[in-house]
Curated annotation (Swiss-Prot):
One GO biological process term: glycolipid translocation
Source organism of this protein record: Saccharomyces cerevisiae (strain ATCC 204508 / S288c)
Pathway(s) this gene product operates in, as recorded in its UniProt entry: Protein modification; protein glycosylation
Protein name, UniProt field: Man(5)GlcNAc(2)-PP-dolichol translocation protein RFT1
Lineage: superkingdom: Eukaryota
One CC-aspect GO term: endoplasmic reticulum membrane
Recorded family membership: Belongs to the RFT1 family.
Taxonomic classification: Eukaryota, Fungi, Dikarya, Ascomycota, Saccharomycotina
Transmembrane stretches, start-end: 25-45, 49-69, 111-131, 149-169, 182-202, 219-239, 320-340, 373-393, 414-434, 444-464, 470-490, 510-530, 533-553
Cytoplasmic topological segments: 46-48, 132-148, 203-218, 341-372, 435-443, 491-509, 554-574
Keywords: Endoplasmic reticulum, Membrane, Sugar transport, Transmembrane, Transmembrane helix, Transport
One MF annotation (Gene Ontology) recorded for this entry: flippase activity
Task of the protein: Intramembrane glycolipid transporter that operates in the biosynthetic pathway of dolichol-linked oligosaccharides, the glycan precursors employed in protein asparagine (N)-glycosylation. The sequential addition of sugars to dolichol pyrophosphate produces dolichol-linked oligosaccharides containing fourteen sugars, including two GlcNAcs, nine mannoses and three glucoses. Once assembled, the oligosaccharide is transferred from the lipid to nascent proteins by oligosaccharyltransferases.
Membrane topology, as annotated: Multi-pass membrane protein
């Protein structure tokens, strides 16, 4: 296993195999971590009020914002580092250079770029936290330990950024198993720390001073959240560093320090006295990073803009309700869609570092199959989600939430999930194949979409008083615009590969399934409506199984082809 992890995947078959296997690892990791956080939230939700969930969601938003702006552009850009040559040299013979030293220089290039997130994140975290601290509700500032909680959140950001060089290397080598394992351990540790502190205070067994009032308990609940985040970051760094000491340092594959890289021009490669230069950052990757960073700024404003809006236009209680919706409503998105989206992005970025026709056509084939899967699953969500979601959610939340509108709002949120998911894979494809100029053009459109999103949110929340439902509708409009933009790009890209053939032509055979889904939906609403008891829920499960059976029969050839390919791949491994 260690040997496999130390090899850079080079052929399209190797990259596809690691990516499909990696998607499974990420899904299992997501399933485990979300199961742990799911259990924790269900335990904590009976101790904590919506107000506390609102402020912890706000603190998590600050942490997520700093980490996103610090590292995501680098994570995307380093995937485009070519592993097919590029004139990186050493003084050893050519064979040894190709096998060992070249790989070392490629990984060192990635490590050098991994320093940039820390340089961005350190000042950004201080500035953003200082700015947001002045805007926090005065009630929370007066809570015990609140300033300590803010400091611990900042410290967790810094510690997590220190693990970035190790993450970048494992990402570039498509070592999904290590990453999934380390993140699972870190999340579990953070959740355990969080729960132990809250539970101990509630039981008053290990009080910090004299904990008698609700204010004291709320202050410690926020402190527990911050301690959990810090424990998560420290554990993640420790796991990655242990992996480095075990698998990388003995082989001297790269240095954790910023290191100059020697290169020579390709046209000088065959001469006896090659002209060599040195650099810290590969120029084409650095230029791509700048353009991607600009684009991601607007993408994050749109992706996380709902939190900005809800912090400005909604009460703390409504913020807590929306945080609960995000946790439960998007559970499927984070467990299934997010790992697939990330695996697709990594797969495409590595595959298309060499733009040959075979790789380009393979990328389209993978995207078409994923899109078909997403459309089927989205149909299931739209047909059965609104009717069943509130029935399932009421068993997971405590009495403190029974007087809120969360059971009604979750039904609206179900319509948002398909748009969120489809946009994820479309933008993953766009970011992987687009040139720097195309990404820059996309950034300008994202700027316009940001303005439309803010305007829609203001109209629907502030003027029409739709509260959280208005925010969800604004998000749906936002996703539709982004899907349309990437859809036009995909269609043009498809026509260049397959002359006079539309990308959307691959989805013309959905008529039967859509009619069946619509019929089931109408019957379900006519005879049952919103599910209120177990008997009605069982009927919906039977309806869902019938629709799923129809989908499986319709796609039986594709499924059989995939199984055959996996069997051939496994036989080669043996």
């Amino acid at each position: 296993m260690a040997k496999k992890n130390s090899q850079l995947p080079s052929t399209s078959e190797q990259i596809l195999e690691r990516s499909t296997t990696g998607a499974t690892f990420l899904m299992m990791g997501q399933l485990f971590t979300k199961l742990v956080t799911f259990i924790l939230n269900n335990l904590l939700i009976r101790f904590l009020s919506p107000r506390i969930f609102g402020i912890t969601a706000f603190l998590e938003f600050i942490q997520g914002t700093v980490l996103f702006f610090s590292r995501d552009a680098i994570r995307l850009s380093t995937l485009r580092i070519s592993d097919s040559g590029n004139g990186i040299i050493d003084d050893d013979d050519e064979e040894e250079y190709q096998e060992t030293h070249y790989k070392s220089k490629v990984l060192q290039t990635a490590v050098n770029f991994a320093y940039i997130p820390f340089w961005i994140g350190f000042p950004l975290s201080i500035g953003l936290i200082a700015w947001q601290y002045r805007n926090i509700n005065a009630y929370f500032i007066t809570l015990p330990f609140f300033r300590w909680s803010i400091f611990l959140i900042w410290l967790s950001i810094i510690v997590e950024l220190l693990s970035e060089p190790f993450f970048i290397v494992n990402q570039f080598m498509l070592n999904y198993a290590a990453r999934s394992r380390f993140e699972s351990i870190a999340v579990t540790t953070g959740c355990i720390v969080n729960f132990i502190v809250v539970y101990a205070v509630q039981q008053s067994r290990y009080p910090m001073g004299v904990v008698t009032s609700d204010i004291d308990k709320e202050g410690i609940a926020i402190l527990a959240f911050a301690l959990g985040k810090l424990a998560h970051s420290i554990t993640l760094l420790a796991c990655y560093y242990w992996d480095y000491l075990k698998n990388f340092k003995p082989k001297k594959l790269f240095s954790t320090r910023l290191t100059k890289i020697k290169t020579r021009e390709n046209n000088e490669l065959k001469k006896g006295y090659p002209k060599s230069t040195s650099y810290f950052f590969q120029n084409d990757i650095l230029q791509h990073f700048k353009k991607v960073y600009f684009q991601l700024c607007f993408k994050h404003l749109l992706t996380e803009g709902d939190k900005l809006i809800i912090n400005s236009l909604c009460t703390v209680e409504e913020q807590g309700i929306y945080a609960l919706l995000s946790n439960y409503g998007s559970l499927l998105t984070r467990l299934l869609f997010a790992p697939i989206e990330e695996s697709l992005r990594l797969f495409l970025a590595r595959l298309l570092s060499s733009h040959n026709p075979k790789n380009l056509k393979l990328s389209i084939e993978v995207l078409v199959n994923l899109t078909r899967f997403y459309i089927y699953l989205s149909l299931m969500i739209i047909v059965f989600g609104p009717a069943n979601s509130s029935f399932l959610l009421q068993f997971l939340i405590g009495s403190k939430w029974s007087t809120t509108s969360v059971l009604d709002t979750i039904r609206v949120y179900c319509f948002y999930i398909p748009f969120l998911s489809l946009n994820g894979i479309f933008e993953a494809f766009f970011q992987s194949v687009a040139t720097g100029d195309q990404i820059l053009k996309h950034s300008y459109f994202m700027m316009a979409f940001s303005g439309i999103f803010l305007l829609n949110s203001w109209l629907l929340i502030e003027k029409l008083k739709l509260s959280i439902e208005g925010l969800i509708l604004s998000n749906i409009i936002n996703m539709v615009l982004r899907i349309l933009y990437c859809g036009v790009f995909l269609n043009k890209f498809h026509r260049e590969l397959f002359t006079d053939s539309s990308f959307f032509f691959n989805f013309k055979d959905f008529k039967t399934v859509i009619i069946a889904g619509s019929t089931i939906c109408l019957l379900d609403w006519w005879f049952i409506g919103y599910v209120k008891n177990l008997q009605q829920f069982v009927v919906n499960v039977l309806f869902a199984m019938g629709l799923l059976a129809l989908i499986l029969v319709k796609e039986r050839q594709t499924i059989q082809s995939f199984i055959n390919k996996r069997a051939v791949s496994n036989s080669k491994d043996v």
